[in-house]
């Protein structure tokens, strides 16, 4: 399922290939988030043109709307959405546990209230796996508890223990999956920001020998130095032959940090979310196109970018579209930001191939951190 092609000699960065049911995926890999099986403001053919082979969709949101029975009628999430590349489906755990005032965690599962209409629902590890089996997801995520930064040790320990128990139950369901279904299960480590809990959780998850491992519960509001500390530590506990996934990181500096410590897959809504508000990713930082200084700027967002926006339209025109609320502006900005992330990942792969990733990261971060446009 996972083959390592090249290890960087001066860091833990590596290039690999995931062999998934709907095609090969080269890692490191940034997954765009298509919560409901589609990217906001980006058609499938645009994503394919950009080189996307793996998209994230969310079980919680698909369960609530359009509903599991609807997708079941189509035979799979791929058939329903017409996306013929790979899907990783998140378990929905993060969304459920974000509803802190509307859910109740039990050892059996979690009771929660829909954010749409207030109706009550109950998720178990088995039911969440079954939904993803109906989707025929290429990568399935187990239900887990994503705890917030700053909780006390006893609560973090309890949530890590429940996550491990749910992982065992998910694995049993996966081992009894329907005939012909060939998706891969990723189990999730937890433990908050306590190293002994991280170690205990990871060792227990590794005993289950799932095809892939995810590091959960980081990038949840903690300081960057704490993020780096736990990222490095938890990644070091996972054998190198396992594909490693950190959920919910999508800013360039966090992604380069993750690659440096041996992470293969990451996702985030950030690139398209900020695009909808007129923020564009560049090698020099965030370009905020709504600012008045771009009103008559005839240059592209980035000179060396080959996306539709940069090859055809000016900064001034994009500012006009975004300020006017035109859908085209959001579409162009979203395409640019996803294209930018894919280009950044390709540059990282090239640096790994040349055993130069450490220097690449250092130079990129020195420029990016200083480069927020202030016009």
Swiss-Prot record:
Q: Which domain of life is it from?
A: Bacteria
Q: How is the cofactor bound?
A: Binds 1 zinc ion per subunit.
MF term (GO), any: metal ion binding
Q: Which cofactor does it need?
A: Zn(2+)
Q: If you read the UniProt record, what top EC class would you report for this enzyme, in one word? A: transferase
A GO cellular component term found in this entry reads:
cytosol
Positions binding Zn(2+) in this chain are 305, 307, 310, 336
Query: Which catalysed reactions does the entry list for this protein?
Result: 7-aminomethyl-7-carbaguanine + guanosine(34) in tRNA = 7-aminomethyl-7-carbaguanosine(34) in tRNA + guanine
The residues that the entry says bind substrate are 90-94, 144, 190, 217
Q: Please state the Enzyme Commission number of this protein.
A: 2.4.2.29
The pathway that the record names for this protein is:
tRNA modification; tRNA-queuosine biosynthesis
**What GO terms describe the biological role, i.e. biological process, of this protein?**
queuosine biosynthetic process; tRNA wobble guanine modification; tRNA-guanine transglycosylation
User: What is annotated as the active site?
Assistant: 90 (proton acceptor), 267 (nucleophile)
Sorted alphabetically, the keyword list is: Glycosyltransferase, Metal-binding, Queuosine biosynthesis, Transferase, tRNA processing, Zinc
Region entry RNA binding: which residue ranges? Answer: 248-254, 272-276
Question: InterPro entries, per this entry?
Answer: ArchSynthase1/Queuine_TRR, TGT, TGT-like_sf, tRNA_ribo_trans-like
Q: Is the Electron transport keyword given for this protein?
A: no
Q: Per the record's keyword annotation, is Endoplasmic reticulum included, yes or no?
A: no
Purpose? Catalyzes the base-exchange of a guanine (G) residue with the queuine precursor 7-aminomethyl-7-deazaguanine (PreQ1) at position 34 (anticodon wobble position) in tRNAs with GU(N) anticodons (tRNA-Asp, -Asn, -His and -Tyr). Catalysis occurs through a double-displacement mechanism. The nucleophile active site attacks the C1' of nucleotide 34 to detach the guanine base from the RNA, forming a covalent enzyme-RNA intermediate. The proton acceptor active site deprotonates the incoming PreQ1, allowing a nucleophilic attack on the C1' of the ribose to form the product.
Q: Kindly state the subunit structure of this protein.
A: Homodimer. Within each dimer, one monomer is responsible for RNA recognition and catalysis, while the other monomer binds to the replacement base PreQ1.
* UniProt record similarity statement: Belongs to the queuine tRNA-ribosyltransferase family.
PANTHER family, A to Z: QUEUINE TRNA-RIBOSYLTRANSFERASE
Q: What is this protein called?
A: Queuine tRNA-ribosyltransferase
Instruction: Say which species the protein is native to.
Output: Borrelia hermsii (strain HS1 / DAH)
Its taxonomic path starts at: Bacteria, Pseudomonadati, Spirochaetota, Spirochaetia, Spirochaetales
């Amino acid at each position: 399922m996972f083959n390592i092609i090249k290890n960087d000699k001066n860091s833990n960065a590596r290039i690999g290939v995931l062999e998934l049911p709907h095609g090969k995926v080269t890692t490191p890999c940034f997954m765009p988030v298509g919560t409901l099986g589609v990217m906001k403001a980006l058609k499938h053919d645009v994503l394919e043109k950009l080189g996307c082979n793996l998209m994230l969709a969310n079980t919680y949101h698909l369960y609530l709307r359009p509903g599991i029975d609807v997708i079941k009628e189509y035979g799979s999430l791929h058939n329903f959405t017409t996306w013929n590349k790979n899907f990783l489906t998140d378990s929905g755990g993060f969304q459920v546990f974000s509803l802190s005032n509307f859910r109740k965690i039990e050892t059996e599962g979690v009771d929660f209230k829909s954010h749409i209409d207030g109706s009550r629902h109950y998720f178990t590890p088995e039911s969440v796996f079954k939904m993803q089996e109906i989707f025929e997801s290429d990568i399935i995520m187990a239900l887990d508890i994503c705890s917030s930064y700053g909780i006390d040790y006893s609560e973090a320990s309890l949530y890590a223990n429940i996550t491990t128990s749910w992982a065992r139950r998910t694995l049993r369901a996966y081992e009894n999956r329907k005939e012909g279904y060939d998706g891969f299960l990723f189990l999730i480590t937890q433990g908050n920001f306590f190293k002994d809990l991280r170690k205990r959780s990871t060792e227990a998850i590794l005993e289950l020998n799932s095809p892939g491992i995810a590091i959960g519960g980081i990038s949840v509001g903690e300081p960057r130095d704490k993020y780096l500390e736990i990222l490095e530590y938890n990644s070091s506990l996972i054998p190198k032959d396992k594909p490693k996934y950190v959920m919910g990181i999508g800013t360039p500096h966090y992604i380069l940090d993750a690659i440096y410590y041996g992470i293969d897959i990451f996702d985030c809504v950030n690139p398209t979310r900020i695009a909808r508000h007129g923020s564009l990713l560049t090698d020099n930082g965030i370009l905020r196109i709504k600012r008045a200084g771009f009103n008559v700027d005839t240059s592209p967002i980035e000179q060396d970018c080959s996306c539709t926006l940069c090859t055809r339209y000016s900064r001034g025109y994009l500012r006009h579209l975004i300020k006017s609320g035109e859908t085209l502006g959001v579409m162009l900005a979203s395409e640019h930001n996803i294209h930018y992330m894919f280009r950044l990942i390709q540059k990282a792969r090239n640096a790994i191939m040349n055993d130069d990733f450490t220097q690449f990261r250092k130079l990129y971060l020195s420029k990016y951190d200083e480069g927020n446009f202030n016009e």
